[in-house]
Amino acid sequence: MGVDLTGVQKKKRVVRHHTYSTNPYIKLLIKLYKFLAQRTNSAFNKLVHQRLLKSRSNRAPISLSRIAVCMKRKSVWLEKGKKAPIAVIVGDVLDDVRMARIPALRVCALRFSKSARERITGAGGECLTFDQLAMVAPTGKNTFLLRGRKSGRESVKHFGAAGVPGSHAKPFTSNRGKERQRSSARRRAFRHK
C-alpha cells in the first residue's frame, strides 16, 4: 500500500544553473565568477555567481542612503587604520536626494545611475565594476555584500486579496467614471441609498 505524498511538489526549490539574460556583460561576469568560485574556496564568489544568475526582479536596486547607513554601521567595528570594506551590490545603485551628504564610499555594482555615480565620486569615493573587483579582491576579502528590497516593486503591493480584513493589498482601480471604483470605498454622493 502506498503513502500519499502531499505537498512534496510545493517544497521544490528553484535553483538556476544558467541565465536567461541576453546581456553579454552579465554572461562574461557569470563565467568569471564561476571560475573564481571553483578555483578559490570562497563563499563570497559562490554567492556573487548565484546572484548574477538571478532574474531582473530578483536583482533589486538599492539606494545610496541605504548603502551609506549599512557601511556606517559596519565601520563602527573597524580597527584603527584599517581600510573600510567595499560595498558589493549585484544590481543597480540609485541616487537618494533625501540624503544631503554622503560619506566617501567604495561601491561595486552592476550599474550606477548617472547622479549616483556623480555623488559617489564627488564625495571622494570609488565606483567599481565586477571585473575590477575580481582584480582587487579575488576571494572577497574586505567586502560587504548588500542587496535591495525585493518587496519594493509596485507589483508586489497588489499581491494578496484587497479588501479582506487584515490584508494590506493595494486594489487595482480605474478612474474612468464616477460610478466606477475609486479606491476601496464608494464616493459619498454615490453610496447605497
UniProtKB/Swiss-Prot annotation:
Q: Which GO terms describe its cellular component?
A: cytosolic large ribosomal subunit
A Pfam family that the UniProt record links to this protein: Ribosomal_L18
Which keywords does UniProt give here? Cytoplasm, Ribonucleoprotein, Ribosomal protein
- GO terms for molecular function, please? RNA binding; structural constituent of ribosome
Q: Which InterPro entries match?
A: Ribosomal_eL18 (IPR000039), Ribosomal_uL15/eL18 (IPR021131), Ribosomal_uL15/eL18_sf (IPR036227)
The processes (GO biological process) annotated in the record are:
translation
Q: Where is this region: Disordered?
A: 158-193
Composition skew (Basic residues), residue ranges: 183-193
Query: Which subcellular locations apply to this protein?
Result: Cytoplasm
The family classification in the record reads: Belongs to the eukaryotic ribosomal protein eL18 family.
- The protein's name is Large ribosomal subunit protein eL18
